[in-house]
Design a protein with these regions (language model features):
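A cytosolic small-molecule/anion-sensing beta-strand core signal
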Residues: 27, 55-56, 72
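Conserved small/polar residues in nucleotide/adenosyl-binding loops
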Residues: 92-93
């Protein structure tokens, strides 16, 4: 169905940190929402790129050669195979 998906409503349905929830699927891709605070492990994805979009708050992503910051309304594409470690000092989604 072509019904709008309300992010605020979807975020209100869970509290777990670092536990992505699938909200839609398209072709071979899943759209996920996640709440974060603190650090995640350094990792990579061998088969696919990964997109981070910040709806509220801010986060950083550490790469091997730099650290970037994403603020509310910003996004970044992490290329497949690129090692990265996402983290957020305060509650972010």
């Amino acid at each position: 169905m072509n019904n709008p998906i309300n992010f605020k409503e979807k975020f209100s349905k869970f509290e777990d940190l670092w536990s992505p929830r699938v909200i839609a699927e398209m072709n071979d891709y899943q759209f996920k929402l996640v709440k974060i605070k603190g650090e995640f492990v350094t990792h990579n994805h061998e088969d696919t790129d990964e997109v981070f979009i910040v709806i509220e708050g801010s986060m950083k992503i550490q790469f091997e050669d730099r650290v970037i910051e994403l603020k509310s309304g910003e996004m970044v594409v992490v290329k497949k195979g690129e090692k990265h470690r996402p983290f957020a000092v305060s509650y972010t989604h």
